[in-house]
């Protein structure tokens, strides 16, 4: 009771900028790995265990054949504190090369902690992520690692030896009588970055994000969401780096379709 077991096997991936299914490769911004190497398949196994209503645990093992393997552990916890709720999200990723290591050496440990406090329509969160080992944190090209840096817009903040801090402020306007409207301010800063292929170390990057979204509450367009996202990104990486100074603005249309 409370245990969910998952396993899967994937041999092709359809990226957002492609019309067909292709073999998987390893994400390699800043020439971290051999991004041209492909894998015949990925297999994973693991599960989630709901210890009680406030605590859940997660453990997974994944292998991207002949590229890398990764073990993931996570702890999610909520605690009523005063008028609000304290949330804790602890995650770890341990990665090494797999099989013939066609993408090159993989040696990374990534540990993160994100703590938030929600009261009324407000939510304040602070987090820290620490990468160690000789390489960046690996993930499949065209996807995102489900860690603390997910949904950043201009960088993945997963470089070798990177130490990342972030602060987030969310507000749900339902608390002010305007249901469906939500906003976010987010600041992410990484330092101690090592870019071996670019002969650079002790580099820094930072990203500031703003979001405003609205989900239509009724009528024929009920559950259609509109979102605007803005980011300002800066770094001191050398020429030739994949991530460069930029400002991004995105507009999204989202739709959630209830099945049951």
Predicted feature descriptions by range:
Residues 2-7, 14, 53-58, 82-88, ...:
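Repeated loop/turn-to-beta-strand initiation elements of outer-membrane beta-barrel proteins
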Residues 121, 125-217:
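C-terminal structural cap/anchor segments
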């Amino acid at each position: 009771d409370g245990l969910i077991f998952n396993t899967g096997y994937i041999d092709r991936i359809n990226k957002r900028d492609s019309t067909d299914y292709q073999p998987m490769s390893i994400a390699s911004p800043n020439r971290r790995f051999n991004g041209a190497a492909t894998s015949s398949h990925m297999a994973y196994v693991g599960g989630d265990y709901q210890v009680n209503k406030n605590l859940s645990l997660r453990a997974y093992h994944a292998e991207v054949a002949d590229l890398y393997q990764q073990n993931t552990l996570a702890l999610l916890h909520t605690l009523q504190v005063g008028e609000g709720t304290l949330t804790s999200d602890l995650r770890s990723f341990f990665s090494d090369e797999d099989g013939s290591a066609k993408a090159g050496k993989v040696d990374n440990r990534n540990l993160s902690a994100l703590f938030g406090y929600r009261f009324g329509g407000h939510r304040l969160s602070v987090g820290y992520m620490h990468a160690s080992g000789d390489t960046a944190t690996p993930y499949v090209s065209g996807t995102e690692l489900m860690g603390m840096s997910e949904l950043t817009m201009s960088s993945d903040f997963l470089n070798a030896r990177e130490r990342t801090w972030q602060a987030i402020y969310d507000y749900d306007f339902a608390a002010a009588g305007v249901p469906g409207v939500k906003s976010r301010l987010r600041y992410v800063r990484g330092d101690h970055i090592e870019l071996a292929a670019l002969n650079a170390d002790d580099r820094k990057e930072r990203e500031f994000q703003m979001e405003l979204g609205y989900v239509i509450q009724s009528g024929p367009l009920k559950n259609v969401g509109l979102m605007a996202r803005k980011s300002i990104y800066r770094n001191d990486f050398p020429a030739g780096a994949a991530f460069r100074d930029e400002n991004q603005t995105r507009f999204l249309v989202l739709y959630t379709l209830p099945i049951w």
